[in-house]
Structure formats: C-alpha cells, structure tokens
C-alpha cells in the first residue's frame, strides 16, 4: 500500500514537472474526435497562422483549430496595438478562416461582446506578464512532443501564468503546460 502511494505521487510529480497531462474525457467527445479527424485536411499549421497574424504588427494572444459549422477553421486572437497597450485602449480581434486552401485568408472580427472582450482581455494580460511569444511556445512543444499542436491558450494555473497547449497525437489529446 505504501509503495503504491509513493509510485502514484512520483507519477504525478513527474507529470507536473514535464507539464504533460492527458485531457480528461475531452478526446471522447464527438466534437473533439471530428476536429482531430479534420486536422489532417489543413494545409497550414497553428504556428503558420500565428506567424501570419504577427506580420501586421498585431500580437497573437491565443490560437486554435476548431470546427465552425462542421468545417475546419484556424482562429487566432490578437491584440492589434501590442502587449503594452491595456485592453480598454487596444483592439482585440479574431482572425479566422479555413486552413484547407493554399493560402490562409482569414476574416477579421473586432470583439465587442462581453464574453469575447473578457476572454481576450485576460489573454492579453497573461501574455503581457510573460516573456515568451506564442510562436516560441508552440516551437518548444513541437520539439518535445509528437503529434500536432492544435491549440495554445494563456491561462492561470496554481497562481501562475502559463500556456495550455493541446496536442493531437494518434487520435488522443495531450495537454501540455508551458511557462509564459
């Protein structure tokens, strides 16, 4: 019994140190399974979308692949005026579109509704507190994890700003936490 407790504690400690956790039941949902299957249709990676949105001077604050009306979409939230401008004086927006074509030509939506403004304001604040860009975070995870990075979101875990990175690997989803 004591040996099991020590073994369990060791496993949890190692998972915490390396920041890798399976996502509890997320990969069991029909939506997640459909998204994982659709990822193979993309001609662009998440890092491609992040880099493209950063070219215009805006700073990417989160990015993900998702299904919009059953179709694959690449979505990147940005802070148009950068990380040093507070949310109330910034332009928080989403660039999204199909990644299935040779060029990713996203539509731009400036957030005005409370849920999107609140979520993107939090992401802006967390990215401003950190030292890493989304590009660096994705690249770091790609070096250590097999599979496809399909989501990166700044979040608060244990009173710290971290990036929650979701990786699709062999039909399963892994959650990797990275320091910002």
Task: Specify the residue positions occupied by each region the protein language model found.
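Long, terminal "pre-/pro-" and other extracytoplasmic accessory regions
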Residues: 2-8, 19-180
């Amino acid at each position: 019994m004591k040996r099991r407790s020590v073994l369990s504690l060791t496993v949890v400690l190692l998972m915490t140190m390396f920041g890798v956790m399976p996502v509890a039941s997320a990969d069991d949902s029909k939506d997640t399974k459909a998204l994982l299957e659709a990822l193979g249709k993309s001609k662009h990676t998440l890092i491609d979308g992040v880099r493209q949105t950063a070219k215009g001077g805006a700073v990417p604050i989160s990015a993900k692949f998702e299904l919009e009306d059953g179709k694959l979409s690449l979505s990147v939230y940005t802070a148009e005026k950068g990380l040093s401008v507070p949310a109330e004086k910034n332009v928080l927006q989403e660039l999204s579109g199909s990644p299935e074509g040779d060029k990713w030509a996203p539509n731009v939506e400036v957030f005005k509704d409370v849920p999107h403004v609140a979520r993107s304001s939090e992401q802006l604040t967390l990215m401003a507190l950190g030292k890493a860009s989304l590009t660096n975070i994705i690249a770091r995870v790609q070096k250590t994890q097999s599979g496809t990075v399909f989501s990166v979101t700044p979040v608060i875990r244990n009173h710290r700003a971290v990036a929650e990175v979701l990786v699709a690997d062999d039909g399963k989803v892994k959650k990797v936490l990275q320091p910002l």
